[in-house]
């Protein structure tokens, strides 16, 4: 399928027009985000969240300004985010541990209909904070970075609290149930609109 390749080229090319690469460079020099010291893992997670949010911001600009490209973007999203393979991963018992890898997998796949907001604590809060349907409110790369800081603040607090309490893997509470998120454990994710 050629369409997703065109979609990927359009997506990457749109960063040249709409992303501020100086802002990305400044992020690389940070040693702290809000009250969190940045070790290598936190920095990589932070950069991943920035990339995800900036991608959605830029895609939103192109969607609104060039509706003729929508089909290519739909092919791109269907290939990488809305595939059955990703849906199977979201529905499985994988990526349910309170760690950075699990949060990243769940966040970057919010567009998939198999999204399960009950998979991790505060996942629904993160989804609402990103507010994909109103992504156009982000006017710049700096706005995407600030939103990413807020997302990371939630995730790092959750991950650090588990590390600090010495809880075992995949334990979200005393009885293994997720008490922190308002999402249902049976899925409940309708995905988010790309356009």
What spans do the regions from the language model cover?
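Short, functionally important secondary-structure microenvironments
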Residues: 1-195
């Amino acid at each position: 399928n050629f369409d997703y390749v065109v979609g990927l080229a359009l997506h990457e090319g749109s960063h040249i027009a709409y992303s501020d690469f100086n802002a990305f460079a400044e992020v690389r020099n940070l040693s702290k985000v809000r009250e969190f010291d940045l070790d290598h893992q936190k920095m990589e997670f932070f950069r991943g969240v920035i990339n995800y949010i900036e991608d959605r911001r830029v895609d939103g600009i192109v969607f609104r300004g060039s509706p003729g490209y929508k089909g290519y973007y739909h092919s791109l999203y269907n290939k990488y985010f809305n595939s059955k393979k990703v849906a199977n991963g979201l529905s499985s018992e994988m990526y349910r541990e309170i760690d950075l890898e699990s949060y990243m997998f769940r966040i970057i796949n919010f567009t998939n209909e198999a999204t399960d907001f009950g998979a991790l604590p505060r996942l629904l809060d993160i989804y609402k904070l990103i507010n994909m349907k109103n992504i156009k409110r982000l006017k710049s790369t700096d706005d995407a970075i600030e939103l990413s800081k807020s997302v990371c603040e939630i995730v790092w607090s959750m991950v650090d609290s588990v590390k600090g309490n010495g809880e075992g893997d995949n334990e979200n509470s005393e009885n293994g149930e997720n008490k922190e998120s308002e999402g249902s454990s049976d899925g409940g994710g309708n995905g988010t609109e790309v356009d």
